[in-house]
Amino acid sequence: MDEALIRKQEEELQHTGRYYKHICFLCVPLLFVSCYLYGLRPLLLCGFALLMGNLCDRLISLLRRRVYRPGDYSNESFALVIALLMPATVDWYVLAAAIVAGVLIGKEVFGGYGSYPFNPAAVGYAVAAVSWPEQVFRYPPPYTSIPLWDASGVATASTISDTLRSGGLINLSGLSLALGEYAAPMGAGSALVLVACGLFLWVQKDIKLSAALSFLVTAGVIVFLFPRQLGLTEDASFAVSAMFRLRCVRDELLTGAMIFSAVFLLNEPYTCAHHRLGRILYGIMVGAFTMGFRYFGVYETGVCFALLAVNSISGWLDRTEVHLYELLHSSWKKQTGKGDAV
């Protein structure tokens, strides 16, 4: 492996390595909630994912003839994020294939640490979603007894997104939605725990809130203006219609792994835009694309596909912002020079 690239990756690891370590640590409270809702199988799945991520890292080190870096937790964090986006009944081979695709195709093919243009966790999830949709988008109800090894016989429920897509209403309280007491991915249901994780990352200065907030605000505005249940309020007053629209916003933002993606996917250091205006535009575009996928697509977790689409231009957003600032600065200098000359 090229020595210059190795040195560059080691320098990048010094700057962003703690982010991936914190992501791994923050998966623990989500895992506790998942085990409370679904038993011990989520613990085995996440342990398997952690092992797979580490083995992929060691395999790549061997193939590239470089020393294994024990302080690099990026592959493990991607593997855990993929696992927590899966249902508790997912088969082992589906999870393994998603992790291998995320680490090898999403990360290592592009050069490894810090060189990939697409979020590896989103890549792995997208591969599994397209290849095995019946495994990825069917979730067991909470408090279901799930066997540890073979969960093929467990009854799975239709997703909340199916109800929303058909124009129906969710018959769940706001507290149940916030606690994750509905059929959802293992780690993406409990909004309260996810918000706490996001605040921790922000306090630790691992993430910026601009991308996540612009993402959620954009999605919320689209839902408020164009709810999928609009026909239910045709003859209602303005106040009733506004309250109904706010309920639709709540239902859309608390389901479909929206909060999870805002915390664990959107702010990945090497796929998110780096400048403030770029991050805001990045979040707006991901939010708009996500609602487009949710309204007109066939997959529940459209945010991963939207994220991959916007990842392709995140670098362009940064470069455009830099060029814009340079243009404004040069224009201001010219105007100042003219003023001084007069």
Predicted regions and their residues:
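Cytosolic-side transmembrane-helix boundaries in multi-pass membrane proteins
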Residues: 1-22, 293-342
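N-terminal signal-anchor module of multipass membrane proteins
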Residues: 1-61, 337-342
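C-terminal ends of transmembrane helices
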Residues: 7, 55-67, 103-114, 196-205, ...
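Alpha-helical transmembrane segments in multi-pass membrane proteins
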Residues: 22-29, 45-57, 74-79, 83, ...
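Structural signature of hydrophobic alpha-helical transmembrane segments
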Residues: 39-51, 89-97, 177, 181-191, ...
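Membrane-interface helix-loop-helix junctions at boundaries between adjacent transmembrane segments
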Residues: 71-151
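Long hydrophobic alpha-helical segments that form multi-pass transmembrane helix bundles
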Residues: 115-195
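Loop-to-transmembrane alpha-helix initiation sites
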Residues: 117-121, 250-258, 279, 297-310
